[in-house]
A protein has these predicted regions:
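Short, well-ordered alpha-helical microsegments
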Residues: 41, 95, 117-118, 181-185, ...
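Conserved G/P- and acidic residue-centered "switch" motifs that form tight phosphate/ATP-binding loops
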Residues: 35
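His/Asp/Glu-rich metal-coordinating catalytic cores
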Residues: 1-26, 30, 38-174, 179, ...
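Structural motif
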Residues: 30, 48, 107, 132-134, ...
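C-terminal regulatory/interaction regions
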Residues: 7, 190, 214, 219-331
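Binuclear metal-ion centers of metallo-dependent hydrolases, dominated by the metallo-beta-lactamase
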Residues: 6, 128, 142-225, 297-331
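Active-site-proximal loop/helix segment associated with metal-binding centers of metalloenzymes
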Residues: 89-102, 113, 117-118, 133-138, ...
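Short internal beta-strands
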Residues: 47-57, 135, 195-205, 255, ...
Length: 331
C-alpha cells in the first residue's frame, strides 16, 4: 500500500484517495481526522473532513468552520476507491482508529490510541477484519515505559489534591487541556462533592463538549483567581512558569503525563509530585496491539526512538519500518 506524507503529521493513500490527519491533495476523495488534538486536527479550518461525532464537536469548539461529516463507530462509509470504518481508539473522547480497504489491501491507522482505554473515551476496539498494513503510534516505544494500572494513578491524583487542600495549599495539576484534563477531572469527581476544580480558560469549552457526551467531570468552573482558594487548578504544563501559576500562594504542583516517568524532564517544572498517567500505549501494550492485529507490515509513527521497538517486532517475526512524522505531544 502506497503511503505518502501529507502535511506535517498526516498521510495520503493515493490508491484509496483517502487522507489521514493531513490535507487532501488534488484528486483525493476525503480527509479523515483521527481525533481533535492539535497535531492531528485540520490546520485549514475551512476544510471538509470526516470524523467521529465527538471529534466533530471538539474541533468545532476549537474553531473549525468547515463541514464535518460525522461517522459512527463501526459504520462503513464507501468512496470511489475505498471503504472506511472508524473504531474507538481509547485515547481521548472521539478518538478513532481508521480502517481502510481498497484494491491495494487493508490498512489500520491507529492515530493516537490507548488500551486499556481512557474512561472518558468511547473505549478501544480493534477491527474484526484483516489488517495487511498497521500504522501505529509509538510515542512511548521503549521498554522503560510500562504504565501502572489506571485506577492506581487516579487514586494518586485524588490523594494529591485532598492532601494539598487539607494542608491549606492549592493543588495545581499540570496536564494538557484536551483529554488529560478531563480525565483528571473525572478522577477527581470520585473524591466526592466537596472536591471543586478550576480549569484553564481554554479548556472550559472542551469540558462542555465532554459533558454533552455524558462524561462526569464533577464540580468545575473556568479559572478565576479570586475564587481559586479551596479548589484544585488544572492547567497546561506550558503555564507553569507564568504569573497564573507562579503567583498562587502555597501552590503544590503535580505533573500528570506519561513523561512524568522521566524525572529529568519533569524537574524542569519544579513539580512536587510526578504522576505518570498517559493517554498512549506503553511499550508492552504497543507490542500486544501489533500481535492482536497480526498485520503483514507494521509502520511505527511518532516515535523518538523507533529502532528499539522495530528490533523487538522483528524478533517476533514482523515485517516493520518507521515513518518520519513530527511528534508534538504532551503524553
Amino acid at each position: 500500500m502506497n503511503l505518502q506524507k501529507s502535511g506535517f503529521h498526516g498521510f495520503y493513500l493515493p490508491d484509496a484517495g483517502i487522507a489521514l490527519d493531513g490535507p487532501l491533495p488534488d484528486g483525493g476523495d476525503a480527509v479523515f481526522i483521527s481525533h481533535a488534538h492539535a497535531d492531528h486536527a485540520p490546520r485549514n479550518r475551512d476544510a471538509e473532513v470526516y470524523a467521529s461525532a465527538a471529534t466533530a464537536a471538539l474541533i468545532r469548539a476549537r474553531g473549525h468552520k468547515g463541514p464535518v461529516n460525522e461517522i459512527s463507530f463501526t459504520e462503513t462509509v464507501s468512496f470511489p476507491r475505498a471503504d472506511v470504518t472508524l473504531y474507538p481508539a481509547g485515547h481521548i473522547l472521539g478518538s478513532a482508529m481508521i480502517h481502510i480497504v481498497s484494491d491495494s489491501g487493508s490498512m489500520l491507522y491507529t492515530g493516537d490510541c490507548r488500551t486499556p482505554p481512557s474512561p472518558t473515551s468511547e473505549g478501544f476496539e480493534l477491527p474484526d477484519a484483516p489488517v495487511d498494513h498497521l500504522v501505529i503510534e509509538a510515542t512511548f516505544g521503549l521498554p522503560i515505559y510500562k504504565w501502572a494500572p489506571h485506577e492506581q494513578l487516579f487514586a494518586q491524583i485524588r490523594d494529591f489534591a485532598r492532601n494539598a487542600l487539607n494542608d491549606g495549599a492549592t493543588p495545581v495539576l499540570l496536564c494538557y487541556n484536551l483529554g488529560k484534563a478531563q480525565e483528571v477531572m473525572h478522577a477527581l469527581a470520585d473524591a466526592g462533592p466537596e472536591m471543586a476544580v478550576q480549569i484553564h480558560g481554554a479548556g472550559a469549552p472542551l469540558c462542555r463538549v465532554y459533558q454533552s457526551f455524558g462524561i462526569n467531570l464533577g464540580r468545575w468552573e473556568p479559572y478565576r483567581k479570586s475564587s481559586l482558594p479551596g479548589k484544585a487548578l488544572i492547567t497546561p504544563a506550558s503555564t507553569a512558569d507564568t504569573a497564573m501559576v507562579q503567583n498562587i500562594r502555597n501552590a503544590r504542583i503535580a505533573y500528570v503525563s506519561g513523561w512524568a516517568s522521566l524525572e529529568a524532564r519533569a524537574s524542569q517544572l519544579l513539580a512536587d509530585a510526578l504522576i505518570p498517567l498517559s493517554d498512549h500505549l506503553d511499550f508492552f501494550e504497543l507490542l500486544d496491539t501489533c500481535r492482536k492485529c497480526n498485520p503483514g507490515h507494521v509502520y511505527l509513527t511518532h516515535s523518538p526512538n523507533p529502532d528499539v521497538a522495530l528490533h523487538f517486532l522483528e524478533q517476533e517475526g514482523f515485517s516493520c519500518s518507521s515513518l518520519d512524522l513530527e511528534m508534538i505531544d504532551d503524553g
